[in-house]
């Protein structure tokens, strides 16, 4: 059986990211699920893809190495919205809300976040409270993890540690725009310890502000992140009626639908998220950057996008 629900959410532009508070529920109970059903579907973004964040590389460390990915004019772009040519909204968390029992979590494997080419990958993840995340530096440049939980009163620091560089890199590697080989530094494992009721976890590099990674903290195993086609799937769901929510760090609030899971059947949901409008963040590209940042042509000429020349045309894939 297939149940199709299509809905949109109007989101006003804002300079803040979404804040998600956990509902007041008891501990999740792991049970053996019999005649469980499944849920699949898609998430699409409707409207113009928002302008990416923009960072002038001459104002930050490692401009030459990190400038291997840039726009050719000294700017590094960070596009929080990963959207395909047909609106497929990738890297969005889809999860059930207020489910108190169901399938076991299974063996825990700490999420691995890589600092590679001066970006944290993946951009969106799911983590568990009181469990580890593992962060690895794959670059010849120094990175620093600053991890926070969000709150209406402001962020709270969870941990702040440096990321070791692999000793296999020659000393001058971090000063070159032509070093593209990656070596793994010593992995750093840190435990996520959230304040009760808070569910949004974020990391940023203390040296390179355009390096971000976000995660929703899960208290049950019924969650997934949309794939390259904006699709999602969950299995072994106990029969019943549930709220299904969609979360992205730069969309205010969560879209919510209700779905009934029948024994042994598959339900389908289609979510359409209206693209946020207006100015979403403080960091954006500016005109006349030479005047504002006193950038000389000599400095700019050293920042060469030898790995990826970034562009933005206001929609679809970059």
Protein language model annotation of sequence segments:
Residues 8-20:
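Bacterial N-terminal signal peptides
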Residues 26-318:
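Extracytoplasmic copper-binding redox domains, predominantly the cupredoxin/blue-copper superfamily
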């Amino acid at each position: 059986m297939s149940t199709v629900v299509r809905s949109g959410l109007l989101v006003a532009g804002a300079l803040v990211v979404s804040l998600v508070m956990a509902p007041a529920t008891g501990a999740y109970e792991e049970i053996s699920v019999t005649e469980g059903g499944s849920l699949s579907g898609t998430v699409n973004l409707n409207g113009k893809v928002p302008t990416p964040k923009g960072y002038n590389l001459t104002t930050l460390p490692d401009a030459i190495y990190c400038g291997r990915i840039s726009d050719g004019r000294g700017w590094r772009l960070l596009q929080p919205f990963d959207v395909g040519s047909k609106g497929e909204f990738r890297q969005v968390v889809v999860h059930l809300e207020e489910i108190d029992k169901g399938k076991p979590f299974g063996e825990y494997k700490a999420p691995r976040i890589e600092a590679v080419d001066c970006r944290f990958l993946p951009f969106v993840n799911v983590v568990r409270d009181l469990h580890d995340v593992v962060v690895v530096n794959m670059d010849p440049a120094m990175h620093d993890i600053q991890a926070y939980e969000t709150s209406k009163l402001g962020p709270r620091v969870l941990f702040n540690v440096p990321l070791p560089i692999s000793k296999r890199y020659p000393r001058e590697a971090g000063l070159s725009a032509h070093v593209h080989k990656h070596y793994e530094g010593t992995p750093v494992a840190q435990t996520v310890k959230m304040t009760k009721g808070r569910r949004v976890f974020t990391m940023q590099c203390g040296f390179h502000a355009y390096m971000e990674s976000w995660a929703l903290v899960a208290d049950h195993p019924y969650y997934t992140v949309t794939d390259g086609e904006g699709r999602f799937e969950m299995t072994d769901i106990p029969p019943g009626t549930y709220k299904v929510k969609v979360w992205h760090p730069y969309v205010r609030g969560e879209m919510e639908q209700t779905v009934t899971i029948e024994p042994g059947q598959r339900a389908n949901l289609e979510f359409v998220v209206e693209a946020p409008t207006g100015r979403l963040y403080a960091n954006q590209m500016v005109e006349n950057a030479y005047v504002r940042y006193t950038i000389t042509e000599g400095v700019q000429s050293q920042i060469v996008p030898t790995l990826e020349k970034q562009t933005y045309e206001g929609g679809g894939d970059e």
